[in-house]
């Protein structure tokens, strides 16, 4: 369908011919009329290894600067890189390509680009080939996608296919590439809801760039089929290119692997720590690595069978056995993977990702734990942060990482401790699960291994080893980590908000919202535009519709002498809908009526104070805990509010106190709160992506709010000065999930009431204990110590009482076929006392003890000695039936059971029934 898209004058004007590759079937363009294959692996092997394709070797910084300078000279504006965590997106967690920086707002035409045309070197993270990293010689988790982009509209074309190809060809020529060796392979591209013609740029068997001409959008009614999906033409059309920085460096050096090309000093350091002699000047060793990378380029090695086939082919080509080759390659591949993964973590944590069990944090923890496992296997005993420091030393162009290193180090140390605890706990958990499958004779399914990793952090290698020790078979795919990473890389699709009366709302103009310009005004006049059921739409309103964690305004609407109570305010597609308390027989309001609205001022101001306090607390938390703090959720109420932030450990009381003091300092400074509607691109360039702490708002214009040092995109209502917030009191902190801390607080009058409640609690406690408030802590501590001593004494007395009872109970035992049965009701005994007594009674193996008591309900404890169990006694079954007779439940093992209920009237019958059941079991 896209064949016409490739009829480009650049090719015909520069001596290219179009051919079809006999191996893959794709069409490609080449200046070499003798060439038959497309130049891409596996159709062509890596010929650049040991034979660099450019005129000189370039290191990463040099190649990056060469590229960016080249495009600046060609009229492009260089822009700064975006973070690897896609803060401006709610559909992906990680930045996976340079074009992701400009989706969805720029690519859709809603927002102008930061420059046009532009050039960038964007660090990206893709974990879909995680298991191939190290093994293939070419795969990376983190890479820089150098790019030049042009955003064309129907009114203005910057440049399109012709100039894009000219620029690419010119860049390669300036690097010293042989024009006859470069091929352009046709390969339609699709992704992120867009598609277009694309050419892959190849040299020496290596793809070094991709040139996408994005001019299609996904459309089920479209007429263009690409990879099974239908597309239609876009009004705008975009040049989306990607040049692999690391691949270009590798091609310039011709190193055996990409890892030796891009971080050789770190590879060598790690090889030394692992006790591996990594001497690339050794021709035999270098030949093994080179041959492995060459042949790996010819196949997908994510599958175990393909990896084994690769081993066989490489071994045969160099004259050694596959086992010998594996013994050489596996440790080296692990070192390569560690070097790659730690660079990935440098960007992940350096850009603010906090390891956790959800979203981007899950992916960071996945990489951390895979790295730690490989380090352990190789005997590399240094902290992972030391390797991160090596990378930071090699990345002076990213000074932000060095500034954040103390936090990066603290996070990683915390993760290492957690992983050690997980392994200890996980082995026991896995053994239990494996025994279950062994008893049932089943093979352990992959779903169980994934659940053990997802829910409990147990690495699949540990699960497989433990299961194997127990004698349970496990099929573990070689691409396990890639599968898990893919599963967690896409954000959950948001449920679309159901719009009631959508047909009526669609015909209405957007409501003018007055509360932004006049935040202190509470009365307004308006015209009724529509009435349906108990919902009213006005031409303008001062009532704030629910959003951004702020509840809806309430108030009244008055028409003539009738006052209608507004109990909810919502907004749908810019139309604000006011909900009246109830549907009356006849709603006293009609379309076209003039109404007087009044906002419930007390509720509004309570919400505004708490919303402004949320911004103040967020900023204070960042100052106390570190720049990695990121808002993950917030909710405001009239009497309190809460803020959820990403943080890798519990907030201490001292830290909470500091946050509270700093927040109140901001209040006392009485700073003016500044709000402004700004162009999205301008706001992002000025303030960065911290704008989107509270979420990513749609549209070209966004409302930017500055509260003290906190600057965010926010559409809520606020105080006009920080002083109007009043006192802020942090009520508590708690960990709501791994990696997320919640602060709960109150502001203004609500804070005063909260503090008064605390004072009342302290005063009442002091009066109860008859001490002053200052003496409360020491008095409570003394009482607690005394309570512990009394508890010890009580336990001792219970043991003595149980011991003294035992002899009497043994004397009263009934003999049934050589088994001595003791059934007894013991008044006012708790479960602990019953258990101790029953335990002593059954120290003799032919004794069965069933004891019952009434204390906070009915308690039942039964035990049986070994001989009794061998004779068929099962006290678990007996206690189960007894418990139903006293209005409860219970059960247990044949030798030990507990139960109880709420109906003491059934105790005698239950005890009698226990004797009958015992005799049945023994006969």
Swiss-Prot record:
Residue positions annotated to bind Zn(2+) are: 611, 615, 714, 718
- What note does UniProt attach to the cofactor annotation? Binds 1 zinc ion per subunit.
Q: Which GO annotations describe the biological process of this protein? A: alanyl-tRNA aminoacylation
Task: Write out the entry's keywords from A to Z.
Answer: Aminoacyl-tRNA synthetase, ATP-binding, Cytoplasm, Ligase, Metal-binding, Nucleotide-binding, Protein biosynthesis, RNA-binding, tRNA-binding, Zinc
Location relative to the cell: Cytoplasm
Instruction: Locate the region Disordered.
Output: 886-909
Please provide, in alphabetical order, the Gene Ontology terms of the cellular component aspect for this entry: cytoplasm
One example GO MF annotation: alanine-tRNA ligase activity
**Known catalysed reaction(s)?**
tRNA(Ala) + L-alanine + ATP = L-alanyl-tRNA(Ala) + AMP + diphosphate
Q: What class of enzyme is it?
A: ligase
Enzyme Commission number(s) of this protein? 6.1.1.7
Q: Which PROSITE patterns match?
A: AA_TRNA_LIGASE_II_ALA
Q: Where is the composition biased (Gly residues)?
A: 886-903
What NCBIfam families does this protein map onto? A-tRNA_syn_arch (TIGR03683), alaS (TIGR00344)
- Family to which the UniProt record says this protein belongs: Belongs to the class-II aminoacyl-tRNA synthetase family.
Q: Which PANTHER family match?
A: ALANINE--TRNA LIGASE, CYTOPLASMIC, ALANYL-TRNA SYNTHETASE
What this protein is reported to do is described as: Catalyzes the attachment of alanine to tRNA(Ala) in a two-step reaction: alanine is first activated by ATP to form Ala-AMP and then transferred to the acceptor end of tRNA(Ala). Also edits incorrectly charged Ser-tRNA(Ala) and Gly-tRNA(Ala) via its editing domain.
Record note on domains: Consists of three domains; the N-terminal catalytic domain, the editing domain and the C-terminal C-Ala domain. The editing domain removes incorrectly charged amino acids, while the C-Ala domain, along with tRNA(Ala), serves as a bridge to cooperatively bring together the editing and aminoacylation centers thus stimulating deacylation of misacylated tRNAs.
* Name used for this protein in its record: Alanine--tRNA ligase
Species of origin? Methanococcoides burtonii (strain DSM 6242 / NBRC 107633 / OCM 468 / ACE-M)
Q: Give the gene name.
A: alaS
